[in-house]
From Swiss-Prot:
Organism field: Vibrio vulnificus (strain YJ016)
Protein name: Exodeoxyribonuclease 7 small subunit
Substrates-to-products reaction catalysed: Exonucleolytic cleavage in either 5'- to 3'- or 3'- to 5'-direction to yield nucleoside 5'-phosphates
Molecular function per GO: exodeoxyribonuclease VII activity
Gene that encodes the chain: xseB
Primary subcellular site in the record, as a coarse category: cytoplasm
Amino acid sequence: MATKKPENMSFEATIEELDNLVDQLENGDLALDDALKKFERGIALARASQAKLTEAEQRVSILLSDSDDAPLSDFSTLAE
C-alpha cells in the first residue's frame, strides 16, 4: 500500500496516523531502522498538521475581523 503524502491527507487522517505511529514508537518493539522511518513519517505528519492548523487560524482570523468596513485581504496558503 502506497503511503500518502501528509499534505494530501485530511487533517483528521493525519492526526489518526500520527497517533498510531506514536503508539508503535512508545511500544518499543521496533527495530532501530523501522523506528527511525516511523519517526521521520511522524515528523512529516506533524509538520503538515501544523501547516493546516496555521492556515485554518488565518482563515478564521480573516472571517472574524472586528470591523465590518475593514478592507478585504487576499487569503494566501502556506503552499504558495
